Each structure stands twice: as structure tokens, then as C-alpha cells.
Amino acid sequence: RYGTEQGVREDYCFLFHGNIPYAGSYGAGFAQTVSEFIYVFDGTPYAIDPAHQEIVTNLLLEHTRWFLAAGQIDMLVRGRGYKSKGYWGAVLESLLVLAQTSDARKNEMASAAIGMLKAFPGINLSLTSAGFADGLKPGSGEMPIGFRYWPTGEIGAYNQPSFHIGFRQYSDRVQDYEYLNRADGGEGEDGWNLAYGFTNILRKDGKGSWYSKDDQRTGSMLSGIDMERLPGTTSRIGGNPGNPKFQYDPSKPTMSTTGYSLNFGRSKLAGGAGEDGGVAGFVLKPAYGEFTARKSLHFFPKGFWALGSDIRSTAAAGASNKKPVQTTIIQWPCGNERPTLILQKGSVQLFPDSTLTLQKIKWFWLEKENVAVVFNEPATVFIRLKNNILSSWLDHGPDPLQAGYAYAVLPGISLEETSLFADEPPFV
């Protein structure tokens, strides 16, 4: 049956270890194992009831595959394992196995598998799954395009032929992140801001990837990624508590610690809707940081507009200790040690370990990466280049009162298209 708290929920979102999106980790393993059982017992007296079988089918077709791009699974559905590159082999193998059964949607699963093989033809498969792949009838198969939102996880996806954008939102129905530390190590300690509006961009050509390219299956997150400045998030920099390491205590039965994680939100307002395009929004009341913000995303074929309003500190006077509230725009690993930003007027070459302030700019375009940011009104933007990773953000100060922002991120666009887009923004 569909879960009421964890597992596959009624909207096909997979939640685990509380209300944490996990379709790309535990959910993928669950789908792979159950698919094998369905295949083995198909057509026998022990066949799985179709009403139960559809739970796995819906998880794969209506949720998990929306978070696949460039051979990896979006980190937003990997729970505490976000620092390891998600490999989509388990998802593909589940689809290939179910396509061999009498499932009513087996043709859809075959088509989905073909789409994955076309999108990432170099994927490694087991011998059995490779045989199933060879046996697929030639036909059309594409990765999903458009917008989807899953309210039980406050998580959404927007897909276009050249890019994927996953995002999370925060409410009293979901938890922020999971940190788990044991004597043998831990994961997830830096996940404070994952639910605070993080817009995770995956380009289908692999550019801008946050993960090392040394292994198809197990690439690790680049060491220079700043987890306090996740794109799309608004946060008080330095305002989150550091999670403690595991310490053995013979008086306690538990052998692990979850630190300061697994906090439910305090706002009831969050949601999203759409099909070809989409819109989503929420009121951010973070677990730590003492501020609030109203945030929304508006998706269209070139990318998305991010809007923020009523960003205000809730800290007592002087209590914030001058830690600034900031909204991060992008964090982009560059293929060039000295990347160039093209501006409306002129250009700026960045140097390693440098931070600069661009005053009142209308837009910038990252040369050779084809990524652009356009502001509705001229904005003062902070730019940092460290470990070949370009980060940009807006600073609202330590005590904001009704601060806001409006910018568009265009993940795959030429310089000429950027200039034309900036000349006719959709807002007045």
C-alpha cells in the first residue's frame, strides 16, 4: 500500500528516514529489489497483486525518472548521501526488468528505458539487464519534459531537452535534511540549506557538474562546493550549528547521532503547480538563522525566474552578531581557471581565490559555459572564484527588513540570446 508517512506516498514521492526525499537512494534500491521479485513470480500462483505492483511502477514512471540527467540522479532525492554522485543504473535495471513482465504499463517502461539509454548510452549494466536492453524493440523513447511537483515531499522538477532543474521547499509537512553519524563515519552534516529553495541545475552535456568525473558510478562532490551557499537558497551565513561527531556513550542505547538535523518546518504555506511550465513557492521559516522570507520560482523553456520578498530578520537587536542574510544565485564549476564574465557593458576576467563586487549590473553571462543570470532591476552582485567554482550571491545585510530579489537563471543560452532576453524582461 502507499505509505502514510514513509515509503512511496500517495503522489508517488519516496520518503524515508522521516520526511526526507530518498527516491535516488533507498527508493532506487527498493524499486530494483521489488522489480526482481515481480519478474520472478510473474505468471505463477505467487504473482504480486497488480494493486501492489503499481506502487513500484508509479514510483519509477511518475517520480524517480524526473530526477535523472546526464547519467546521474539529482542529489535532492538522495537524502544524506548527496555528496556521492547518484548512479541511475538501479532505476534503468528496474525498468528493463518490469518491461519483461505482464504489467499493464510494460510498454511505457520499455519506452522509458529506451529514453535513458539514448540519453546516456555509455551506462554500465549487469549481463542480464544488458540482455534485456538488447531485446527492446526499436521505438521512441525520451526523457520526461515539463514540470512536476510532489507535495508530500515539497519537491519539484523542471526538465527541458538540454537541462534539468530540481528544487526543494520547506514547510511543517517535511524535514530539512538528515545527518547520521556512527562510529564508522557519517554523512549529511552540511545539509542545513537543502530544503530552503535549493535549485539544482544539471546540464545534459555534463557542464557545471558538482561531482568528479573519475568514476561513472561513484564520483564524489567537488571539495570546493560551498554548502552554505546553495543556489536559490536564502540563509544567514554562519547561522547554522555545526553537527557533532559521534561519541560513544555506554549509557545510551543508540549508536548514532543525528545532530541538529531532521527539523520540521514552521510554515504551512508551500506548493507548486504546472505541466509544461510551472510555478512554486513557499514561506521560508528556517530552523536556524532567525529570519523569514517569501520565495517563488517560475519556470519557462529557457530557465526560471526566482522571486523573493519580505526577507526580514527576526533576531533581537544585535543578536545576529552581524552575520549576513544572503540569497545565492548560482554556484558553477568552470572548465577554465580564469573564466570571463560578459556584462551588459564590458567584461570581467576572474582570477583564482578572488572575490569582487559588481555594482548595479543588469545581467552577466559566463563565457564558454553558456550560463546567464538576468536581473529585473540593476543589482549589486558578489562574485567569488575559488577552486574553479564561481559563486554569486546577493547580500541583504545582517538585519534585513522587507528585502527582496528578482533574477532569472538561464542554464544553456548564448550571449546574443542573453542580451535579447534582458532587453524585454516579463516584469514591470
Protein language model regions, located:
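Active-site lining segments of carbohydrate-active enzymes
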Residues: 1-48
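Extended polysaccharide-engagement surfaces of secreted carbohydrate-active enzymes
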Residues: 30, 37-428
